[in-house]
């Protein structure tokens, strides 16, 4: 599913050398303190930054050779980014439907209601926990084969964190051949969720 071999990135005062593998049907955790290179690894994996060395394979292809249809199989959550705060959940659903052929708008809106996320309210009016749940739901909504989740529980209270982790568990039960790569600096989150570190 995913193989990273000696991924290297160097900045002033920072040097990354990361190797890891994510197997089909597994949840793999990437743990480390803030500033250890978790987000850098994810950004390189997604082609958002250019690595200084190493190799990344996704779905058996080099990351730089992924085609748009391959990228459709990825679901992504970054802790420090998301949707325009001026959109509603229904507005996001319309955008997602135009991007992802496998996106089920009605299922997405039903899941929003299930997790008490109003579909007609602007995202900027959501609480921190609501925004986190919404980002994860959006990443899950098009039946991604590989979820890349960068600190999806950061800043959440215990109840919201448990809800997000349960969303991921349910997804894996329903999509047994999918995989998740999740990062966190909270070891208890990963210990309760992951098959591998």
Segments from the language model and where they lie:
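A short, flexible loop at the N-terminus of ABC-type nucleotide-binding domains that lies
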Residues: 1-20, 24-26, 67
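The feature captures the beta-strand-to-loop junction immediately N-terminal to the Walker
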Residues: 31-33
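Helix N-cap at the start of a conserved alpha-helix in ABC-type nucleotide-binding domains
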Residues: 36, 158-160
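Helix-to-loop junction immediately C-terminal to a conserved catalytic motif
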Residues: 46
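Conserved ABC transporter NBD signature motif
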Residues: 54-65, 69-70
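ABC-family P-loop ATPase nucleotide-binding domains
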Residues: 76-135
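Catalytic Walker B motif of ABC-type/P-loop ATPase nucleotide-binding domains
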Residues: 147-151, 156
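Helical segment within the ABC ATPase nucleotide-binding domain
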Residues: 161-176
């Amino acid at each position: 599913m995913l193989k990273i071999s000696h991924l290297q990135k160097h900045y002033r005062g920072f040097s990354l050398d990361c190797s890891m593998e994510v197997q089909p049907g597994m949840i793999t955790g990437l743990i480390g303190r803030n500033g250890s290179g978790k987000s850098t690894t994810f950004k390189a994996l997604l082609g958002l930054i250019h690595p200084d060395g190493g190799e990344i394979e996704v779905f058996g292809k080099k990351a730089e050779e992924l085609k748009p249809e391959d990228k459709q199989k990825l679901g992504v959550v970054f802790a420090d980014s998301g949707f325009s705060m001026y959109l509603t959940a229904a507005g996001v659903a319309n955008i997602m439907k135009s991007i992802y052929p496998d996106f089920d708008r009605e299922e997405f809106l039903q899941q929003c209601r299930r997790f008490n996320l109003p579909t007609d309210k602007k995202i900027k009016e959501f609480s921190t926990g609501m925004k986190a749940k919404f980002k994860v739901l959006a990443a899950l909504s098009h039946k991604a084969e590989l979820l890349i989740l960068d600190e999806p529980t950061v800043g959440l209270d215990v109840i919201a964190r448990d809800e997000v982790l349960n969303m991921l568990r349910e997804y894996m039960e329903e999509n047994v051949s999918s995989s998740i790569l999740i990062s966190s600096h909270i070891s208890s989150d990963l210990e309760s969720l992951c098959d591998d570190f």
